[in-house]
Amino acid sequence: MGLLIFWPGMMSHDSIIQWNQLSQNRYSNLQPVFHTLFMKSITMIWDSPGAVCLVQILMLGTLLGFFLKELESLGIKKKYIWLSSALIAINPINIVLSITLWKDILYTILVLWCCLMFLKIGKIKTQFYSKTYNIILLPIVFVLPYLVRWNGLFILIGCFFFLYLLFPDKRRINAT
């Protein structure tokens, strides 16, 4: 609903600079180029800031759904899951931010994804690493915030440090 009210989304000075870069195919790393290319890939299908906002909404909604599903699998009662879902959905801040073309929005989604990965690791411990999918996905998810915002380097370092602390008995990898 928020996207329809503020169609085609909300843009700041930085957003307009990035939009000009992707429109002219002239990129600057003043704003992390990865985020500009992310927006460009979406606009190749539908050339509108609204398309980027729609993808942000879908990404955030999907990720929050997975997060709430994980919480439910940990034994949180469904009524609290539904209450959380409703509060997240009607929170004016979430509505406005999800339709704003800032790298900060994608960054937040990616940091939330890192948190979801840690929730899964905490839930199934070392079994998490028994799936090749998880071994491949984990470093990718940890690197993505850094590609979107320069201070995402702290997230990257923090995630790997936290993994190191989580599994003191797994710090040595056997080459056999």
Where are these regions (language model features)?
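Transmembrane-helix motifs of polytopic, lipid-linked glycan transferases
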Residues: 54-75, 113
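Short acidic/glycine- and proline-prone juxtamembrane loop motifs at membrane-interface regions
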Residues: 99-106, 148
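Extracytoplasmic catalytic/substrate-binding loops of multi-pass membrane glycan-assembly enzymes
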Residues: 5-18, 26-38, 42, 46-50
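Transmembrane-embedded, aromatic-rich helix segments that form part
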Residues: 151-166
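Specific aromatic-rich, kink-prone transmembrane helix
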Residues: 23, 66, 106-126, 142, ...
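Membrane-interface alpha helices of multi-pass inner-membrane proteins
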Residues: 134-149
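Transmembrane-helix signature of polytopic, membrane-embedded enzymes
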Residues: 67-90, 108-109, 128-129, 133
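Short helix- or helix-capping micro-motifs
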Residues: 81-92, 116, 142, 146
